[in-house]
Regions:
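Membrane-cytosol interface segments of multi-pass membrane proteins
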Residues: 1-186, 230-234
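Alpha-helical transmembrane segments and terminal signal-anchor/GPI-anchor hydrophobic tails
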Residues: 181-241
């Protein structure tokens, strides 16, 4: 049976990390720190524009997270017929695992920013401690605090909280969930709510995982030429992600 395996997930994560590095290092002149960078064979403006577009790495991480969460829940509840207590425990376990995984790199980065005088938190011992604690648990953005990681860390928690609700909506409305999410998303984007940039990813990842879209795409043979078929499938799958 053809499956979108953990190995495939790690490969996509590797691509997303490459996007992340390009975006943070080369999307703006100020981010190069005055260093002379050669973008050969591309013109510098074009290379920087491509790097700027790689901000979609956050969306890729969010997609993979929800995709994995859906498969995990589906393995236990094929019909997604779980109750509120089960959903709460599922989110809580994932949240604890998420926080513990982030503990070492977070503490390390806080230490480095303190030593290099690039600290992101407000002045004052008490305010710093409160901000660090809220940031670590992913709730800094919710309470208006300063954050060391300004996007995907708090977003990972918000996506986790949305997931059980989105899954129940999908259970009832199937693919229509994407249209249902687009309506509030379009309204909130006008209000400059950061989460809505990635809100559409949640139902899409759920649909892709449940309907085995990648598995079907992998077994799809659109052209007689194997090489051209692989290239076409690569283009289609990249566009989907």
């Amino acid at each position: 049976t053809i499956k979108f395996t953990k190995k495939n997930t790690l490969a996509v994560k590797g691509i997303a990390i490459s996007f992340l590095l390009c975006y943070h290092c080369f999307s703006q002149t100020a981010r190069m720190g005055g260093a002379e960078v050669s973008f050969w064979p591309l013109p510098q403006n074009l290379a920087m524009l491509i790097s700027l577009c790689m901000v979609h790495c956050v969306g890729m991480f969010a997609f993979l997270s929800v995709y994995g969460l859906t498969l995990s829940m589906k393995s236990k509840y094929p019909e997604y017929d779980f109750d509120g207590h089960t959903a709460t425990l599922f989110v809580l376990k994932r949240y604890v695992k998420l926080v513990l995984t982030f503990l070492v790199p977070f503490v390390f980065c806080v230490g480095v920013t303190f030593v290099t005088d690039t600290f992101r938190y407000p002045a004052g011992m008490f305010a710093n401690i409160i901000s660090i604690i809220m940031d670590f648990f992913g709730v800094g953005h919710m309470f208006g605090g300063r954050m060391l990681v300004s996007t995907w860390w708090y977003l990972s928690l918000e996506v986790l909280l949305i997931f059980p609700v989105a899954l129940q909506i999908y259970r009832k409305y199937s693919w229509l969930i994407m249209m249902l999410f687009l309506l509030p998303g379009s309204f909130l984007i006008e209000k400059h709510v950061h989460l809505t940039k990635y809100l559409f990813i949640v139902p899409r990842a759920i649909c892709f995982a449940d309907q085995q879209v990648f598995e079907r795409l992998k077994s799809w043979k659109p052209l007689k030429s194997q090489a051209l078929s692989k290239f076409l499938k690569f283009v289609v799958s990249t566009g989907m992600i």
